[in-house]
């Protein structure tokens, strides 16, 4: 059977929260089958566990934020994206603040941590959410949609009307049957505009943001000396975010995702819309890995390779 996965050993790192600017210690620990991805605020007098769940996402204005009884864990999308890309089903994530550290602004550090810990198959069937009917959410001209598809593919279109973004392409379509998440998506960094960063800092946000963890643009160009990691890094980062946002549903999706100018809020609304229509999906497992969609085998150590 196609089995669930966790990590083999505990790994730790330290970073800063992109909005608080505060130091955050992050520890990843193995978890038993059917645990899911569970975030734990270990800095509190009594640690609070918050399982990743579409219905636990609260604030989505600047990041995807898990909330439970007034306790928050913010900016979970890059780590969740890495877990999706590497096929991690079960994991404990201990943090000493309310933000997951931003690291370099991509999912690459989290991929490295998970690969360093080692990936271990578990004696339990991996569960997928198979979309059986189309589901769509719209907000003005923005939309996000899931269609039935035996695999996982995404088509994302952005519209930033900026010379540097225009040059790199505003649309990307990826099918993970023939694309490596680690090579092609994981290193894409978050990005922002210099004038917006200043406004956010005046509001007490983006205190940890810098060119070490984001692509920064002025009105005309990219300000980072080292330029881009991918020719189409902007749209690839939006896809990286979407993969993480979608993975909070608790299992990998078997679906085709299409989005235009979508963000954390619309992605979460799409998951809630799917879950509200039980006839639009089913939970499936694969007794024979050969019958599973291409790209979910364990041999390559990744889900999408």
Curated annotation (Swiss-Prot):
It catalyses: a UDP-3-O-[(3R)-3-hydroxyacyl]-N-acetyl-alpha-D-glucosamine + H2O = a UDP-3-O-[(3R)-3-hydroxyacyl]-alpha-D-glucosamine + acetate. InterPro entries: Ribosomal_Su5_D2-typ_SF, UDP-acyl_GlcNac_deAcase, UDP-acyl_GlcNac_deAcase_C, UDP-acyl_N-AcGlcN_deAcase_N. GO terms for molecular function: metal ion binding; UDP-3-O-acyl-N-acetylglucosamine deacetylase activity. Disulfide bonds: none annotated. Pathway: Glycolipid biosynthesis; lipid IV(A) biosynthesis; lipid IV(A) from (3R)-3-hydroxytetradecanoyl-[acyl-carrier-protein] and UDP-N-acetyl-alpha-D-glucosamine: step 2/6. Catalyzes the hydrolysis of UDP-3-O-myristoyl-N-acetylglucosamine to form UDP-3-O-myristoylglucosamine and acetate, the committed step in lipid A biosynthesis. Keywords: Hydrolase, Lipid A biosynthesis, Lipid biosynthesis, Lipid metabolism, Metal-binding, Zinc. The active site is at residue 264. GO terms for cellular component: membrane. One of its GO terms (biological process) is lipid A biosynthetic process. Its cofactor is Zn(2+). Pfam families: LpxC. It comes from Burkholderia mallei (strain ATCC 23344). Zn(2+) binds at residues 78, 237, 241. This is UDP-3-O-acyl-N-acetylglucosamine deacetylase.
